[in-house]
Regions:
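Bacterial N-terminal signal peptides that target proteins for export
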Residues: 1-10
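Bacterial N-terminal signal peptides
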Residues: 9-20
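Short, low-complexity N-terminal intrinsically disordered segments enriched in polar/charged residues
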Residues: 23-60, 64, 157
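Hydrophobic pocket/interface hotspot
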Residues: 46, 58-59, 66, 78, ...
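Short beta-strand segments enriched in hydrophobic/aromatic residues
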Residues: 62-63, 121-123, 150
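A short gly/proline-enriched turn/hairpin at secondary-structure junctions
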Residues: 67-77, 91-96
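Surface-exposed, charged secondary-structure patches
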Residues: 83-129
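Short beta-strand edge/turn micro-motifs at domain boundaries
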Residues: 129-159
Length: 159
């Protein structure tokens, strides 16, 4: 039953995200691009903005040709699409988003301009912490690309 509920929720979120960009595109004003002085500052800004669900700060990190690689080969390309992705992420949990989730970096290694980062996510609405890893590719003070293991379907929500 819980698995069916999770599946239904995931499908509803995906359906909402597939329609939402068309509805929000006309009203979505992308923030100015804002560079950071070091790769570490790029990562720190991303994690802090993500934890605060600060959409403007999140999207300000990504250049026009940025990419986010999700599970199952899904690639989100460009600032507008990335903005739409984070708009869905930053909704309240009751609206299908994850506002209030907190990512804590457990270990991070910088290789060139790329971080291999292990993190744990927790939130008042999660039944247990969720662990994952991301690769954050920085370039010229921006978040050029991200590859994530994050799987919203694997989150265990409180009942």
């Amino acid at each position: 039953m819980q698995r069916r509920w999770k599946y239904s929720c995931i499908m509803a979120i995906l359906a909402t995200l597939s329609v939402t960009p068309h509805l929000q595109a006309a009203e979505m004003q992308l923030p100015d691009i804002r560079t950071q002085p070091t790769p570490q500052a790029v990562l720190d800004e991303h994690i802090d903005a993500l934890n605060k669900c600060d959409w403007n700060r999140l999207v300000a990190q990504y250049p026009e040709d940025a990419q986010i690689h999700l599970l199952n080969g899904t690639i989100i390309t460009g600032r507008k699409a990335i903005g739409e992705l984070f708009a869905g992420f930053c909704k309240d949990p009751k609206d299908g988003g994850l506002n209030g989730i907190n990512f804590k970096v457990i270990q991070s290694t910088l290789i060139g301009g790329t971080f291999a980062t292990h993190w744990v996510a927790s939130a008042p609405f999660l039944a247990e912490p969720y662990k994952g890893s991301d690769a954050y590719i920085t370039k010229d003070g921006l978040m050029q690309a991200m590859v994530t293991t994050f799987d919203g379907a694997a989150l265990k929500m409180k009942k």
